[in-house]
């Protein structure tokens, strides 16, 4: 199994130096990173971070940076519902890619505060899954996939302003977009090349 090295940073707190992992340091600036496949463990971590930041300051913006190929629908929807549950604005940023559930989470940010860097790529498609078991099991799982397909299309329609029928049609196959195309589609609001281009003036303190 490939191990990912998590960098540590050292800060001078006035009472000596303190080391912390990079994600904890970013959390101090209300920055949450989704930088891998969206799994249940990742979703639980992201949700805990979001709820912690809400408890610290229920009015101050939270920044969510996304570089993800997508992942499990239930995990992604758990993060989506949490974003909508928060009382504060959530600024979403696509860096690299936001595919599948990653694209849905990108679009779920506060309208006017959904961003992508210039060379980012976004992709939407219909849900898929390996179906095994008895014929009755296969029927049930196929019906669930169709239900999720309509459910996700409704969410994307609400977030982007596109008709549900267009979302369903475009999602039949992998539907890729560049940053400018994503603006036209309604996934994001602005392409930014610098933190100064956003409405959030304190992206990193």
Swiss-Prot record:
Any one GO molecular-function label of the UniProt entry: ATPase binding
Keyword Cytoplasm applies: yes
Location(s) in or outside the cell: Cytoplasm
Pfam families: CLP_protease
Coiled-coil region(s): none
First and last residue of the signal peptide: none
An example Gene Ontology CC term for this record: endopeptidase Clp complex
Domain of life: Bacteria
PROSITE patterns in UniProt: CLP_PROTEASE_HIS, CLP_PROTEASE_SER
EC number: 3.4.21.92
Organism the protein comes from: Chlamydia abortus (strain DSM 27085 / S26/3)
Reaction it catalyzes: Hydrolysis of proteins to small peptides in the presence of ATP and magnesium. alpha-casein is the usual test substrate. In the absence of ATP, only oligopeptides shorter than five residues are hydrolyzed (such as succinyl-Leu-Tyr-|-NHMec, and Leu-Tyr-Leu-|-Tyr-Trp, in which cleavage of the -Tyr-|-Leu- and -Tyr-|-Trp bonds also occurs)
Active site: 100 (nucleophile), 125
Family per similarity comment: Belongs to the peptidase S14 family.
Gene label: clpP2
UniProt protein name: ATP-dependent Clp protease proteolytic subunit 2
Keywords assigned: Cytoplasm, Hydrolase, Protease, Serine protease
């Amino acid at each position: 199994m490939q191990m990912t090295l998590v960098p540590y940073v050292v800060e001078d707190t006035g009472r000596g130096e303190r080391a912390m992992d990079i994600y904890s340091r970013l959390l101090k600036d209300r920055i949450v990173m989704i930088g891998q496949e969206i799994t249940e463990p990742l979703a639980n971590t992201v949700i805990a971070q979001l709820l912690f930041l809400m408890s610290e300051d229920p009015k101050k913006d939270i920044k969510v940076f996304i570089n993800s190929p997508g992942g499990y629908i239930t995990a992604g929807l758990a993060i989506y519902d949490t974003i909508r549950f928060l009382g504060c604005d959530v600024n979403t940023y696509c860096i690299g890619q936001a595919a599948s559930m990653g694209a849905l989470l990108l679009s779920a940010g506060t309208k006017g505060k959904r961003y992508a860097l210039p060379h980012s790529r976004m992709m939407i498609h219909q849900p898929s899954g390996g179906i095994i078991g008895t014929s009755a099991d296969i029927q049930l799982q196929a019906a669930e996939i169709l239900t999720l397909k309509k459910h996700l299309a409704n969410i994307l329609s609400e977030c982007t302003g596109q008709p549900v029928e267009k979302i369903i049609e475009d999602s039949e196959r992998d539907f890729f977009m560049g940053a400018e195309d994503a603006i036209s589609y309604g996934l994001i609001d602005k392409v930014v090349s610098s933190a100064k281009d956003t409405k959030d003036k304190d992206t990193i303190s």
